[in-house]
């Protein structure tokens, strides 16, 4: 038994209706790296052999009686791999457009809460003979950094690693209501002990937020009590999604970063802002003010994590979609990102995780339902959700099949119906765009806007580069 922390539990509480809080993980395999090629029975066997390497795959959640504490993870004695691993063929010709349309259908369904909260679709028929593993993994299990650890456990470092031998598994029966109630009462003192320090941290945060709010300059970060400017992405969720993805050369992103003296994350945020600006211009409503993005920030380093979970928090950053000039936009983005880092360092002891850890389940669930009823008017996640996760630098393998590409994105929410996430993998900078189908009819337009913004910055960087820099 392991109890969910506050953020883990929040991800469950936010579920419901058309809000799906599962994340999307896509690994595209190249079977040509195996002399025997692709085999569905072999893939099924690998999942069977490797399930024990990811203990979360066998964990289901159980609520705490009377809502006295957050839910718990327990091993599922009825775990059935075939209920989680499915097989499907991508419509011809198996290009990225057909694949992404299939992913939209796969994603837009809630996971079965009576089972472990994940599902993998093995998608055959991609162009070039490739195969994709499309995994829905509930955000309650892990944040992006934790998923990196899962990747390291599930995939090989080399194609020649010895087969994994699964040990015997005998899960205990599900705990009774009485047991779960006893565990909640046992854990209650430690929970109560966190109240005083958290209240002090919240009080300090309120003071800091007020100091930030006194200055309307965009060099200070947006705060929770500041409403984001209204836009087309701030609406309630429908049941359908739109999805697109594309790989960019990581070397080009690094070139822009190095030459223009900013971080890779600055480049990413500036390109997101450029993409949103182009999209809104085509919609006839160009932004006249800075927008606000919700951005996850790491709290606990990977080395200090005892088990998978959500150890990250979130803060807000100005998205400078109001600036037309790409270099001015990048400079303003750099200042905004630095301000957000400083703000988070001062307020992280009173972040969403610390507060949610103490609030009763029924209160949080009630607030989540109210946010859904009002179509996200609580303005919790502002205009856009963005994330940039540095992934593996070396290729990974499933058996002898090389992982050719890796894509990942988080969920969207009532009031924040657009998510743009990038994961780097080897020499790739892999972008996903996930949106509500009513809020954004065509995510390929946003992806194209990101590409155009990247090309603008790359051209500007190369125009400024010295001959020595261009040679390297």
Swiss-Prot record:
What Pfam families does the record tag this protein with? WS_DGAT_C, WS_DGAT_cat
Q: Which UniProt keywords apply?
A: Acyltransferase, Glycerol metabolism, Lipid biosynthesis, Lipid metabolism, Transferase
**Can you name a GO cellular component term?**
plasma membrane
Q: Where is this region: Disordered?
A: 217-238
Q: What induces it?
A: Expression is controlled by VirS. Induced at acidic pH and in macrophages, and in response to low levels of nitric oxide (NO).
Specify the pathway. Glycerolipid metabolism; triacylglycerol biosynthesis
Reaction(s) catalysed by this chain, per the record, are: an acyl-CoA + a 1,2-diacyl-sn-glycerol = a triacyl-sn-glycerol + CoA; di-(9Z)-octadecenoylglycerol + (9Z)-octadecenoyl-CoA = 1,2,3-tri-(9Z-octadecenoyl)-glycerol + CoA
Q: Which InterPro entries match?
A: Acyl_transf_WS/DGAT (IPR014292), CAT-like_dom_sf (IPR023213), O-acyltransferase_WSD1-like (IPR045034), O-acyltransferase_WSD1_C (IPR009721), O-acyltransferase_WSD1_N (IPR004255)
Transferase in keyword set: yes
- For this protein, what is any one GO molecular function term? O-acyltransferase activity
Q: Does the keyword Flavoprotein apply?
A: no
Q: Looking at the record's lineage, which domain of life comes first?
A: Bacteria
EC number(s) of the enzyme? 2.3.1.20
User: Family, per the entry?
Assistant: Belongs to the long-chain O-acyltransferase family.
Q: What is this protein called?
A: Putative diacyglycerol O-acyltransferase Rv3087
| Source organism | Mycobacterium tuberculosis (strain ATCC 25618 / H37Rv)
